[in-house]
Amino acid sequence: MREANVYSEIVPHTVTAADIAAKRPAGIILSGGPSSVYEEGAPRLDEGIFELGVPVLGICYGFQVMAVALGGEVAKTGHREYGSTAVRVSAGARGGAGFLLDGQPGDQTVWMSHGDSVAKAPEGFDVLASTDDTPIAAFANDGRKLYGVQWHPEVKHSEHGQAVLENFLHRAAGIPADWNSGNVIADQVAAIRAQVGSGRVLCALSGGVDSAVAAALVHKAIGDQLVCVFVDHGLLRRDEARQVQEDYVSATGVRLITVDAEEQFLAALESVSDPEAKRKIIGREFIRVFERAQADLVAEAASEGDPIRFLVQGTLYPDVVESGGGAGTANIKSHHNVSGLPEDLQFELVEPLCTLFKDEVRAIGRELGLPEVIVGRQPFPGPGLGIRIVGDVTRERLDLLRDADAIVRAELTAAGLDSEIWQCPVVLLADVRSVGVQGDGRTYGHPIVLRPVSSEDAMTADWTRLPYHLLAKISNRITNEVEGVNRVVLDVTSKPPGTIEWE
């Protein structure tokens, strides 16, 4: 939707028609899902949504829910369709008889993922498309502006999927393509000013894109009311602390205070290997450091009559969704931006990016004039290398992982692939010892995992097919140059089922 320059929000299936009406949406899209409409406890929706007079598009499971709700039938046909599937669009549908598939080729490849199928369309609906195993792959009632497709138009594997979405958004729903990063900046600047007023604000700079753009956005809104604090927790990659202090300050001119808290974080993480526990400890210690760091700032602000009450966080939309953002969603894992905060948190949160995806954050950063070295930086988690060590975190393990990570980043840059991949986490399997032969003797070292992934918004991702010669060079350098490592492996898992980070 946002690629079509239309703003959108995600709400749970339990939302009522009245709640939807109160939001005054221009269109509604019902998403796909893994359930069967006939399963006990399968997600349902308030059928009054179809009576609001708002255009609705059902996708995959949403298509089937719509069919059943409006009097159609869904059945287990015995035929399942997963992956690339050939679909045939009717001549009328592609020739201007309706909005949804108008202008599309008669034969095209789409991405399917379903076991059940719509066996009978609701009364008043025209069948628009079919496959060999699915006679009703799309339907429409243009008079009521209700539409559905069995395939997934939102994924790139559906050749003309974006055109389907844009036909629904712009033609059926009549939504103009006028949402862009400039709109977001103006809206957020106004929202920040309304929330903060003349108050003083703290922001943690982690070295990543999210916190950098969040801080720049807040600084644009309130200027010198913002003070940025860079907590060097000792979990950063090589040279990252220096880059934060030099690159960001020179680009924005914001006031930056650096706190060296490495010893505190390492002490708190001692002998802790559980991933969730590490995330929560890191989140907790971040806040504790802030509470101490603010002492001088509070005294300064108090002398000026402006207490510090606000904390900026670079929370993104995927962080909220993955942390279980509503009924019917699963908590995939806690995020440092939305979990692990102590109950006695003394700040009111300012989260200017919490409705945005990573690619949108980068666009806003460029619009704000941040240098490419900052906005083009590969994503790096707030808990840093602490969650890229599978096992407990020690100074020695951090140094080992930094060396391996530096080699990977240098080789990707030299190969000109920085813009081709989303990110490449380098993971140390610290709790695993692998037997090897180096020199004339047997060794027991730790494996290093390479996790190159391609994505646009971090909600889904696929592993990046790096050239074999590059993988060989990276492996040879790591096993020869990083003491304690005798094996390099490649993670070839997509998301889903795996998340991008190992922990």
Swiss-Prot record:
Binding site for ATP: 206-212
Domain (GMPS ATP-PPase) ranges: 179-377
Gene Ontology cellular-component terms listed: cytosol
Catalytic activity: XMP + L-glutamine + ATP + H2O = GMP + L-glutamate + AMP + diphosphate + 2 H(+)
EC number: 6.3.5.2
Residues covered by the Glutamine amidotransferase type-1 domain: 1-178
Metabolic or biological pathway, per its Swiss-Prot or TrEMBL entry: Purine metabolism; GMP biosynthesis; GMP from XMP (L-Gln route): step 1/1
UniProt GO MF annotations: ATP binding; GMP synthase activity
Gene3D superfamilies, alphabetized: 3.30.300.10, 3.40.50.880, HUPs
Recorded superkingdom: Bacteria
Active site: 60, 152, 154
Keyword vocabulary terms for this entry: ATP-binding, Glutamine amidotransferase, GMP biosynthesis, Ligase, Nucleotide-binding, Purine biosynthesis
Assembly information from the UniProt record: Homodimer.
UniProt function note: Catalyzes the synthesis of GMP from XMP.
UniProt-recorded name of the protein: GMP synthase [glutamine-hydrolyzing]
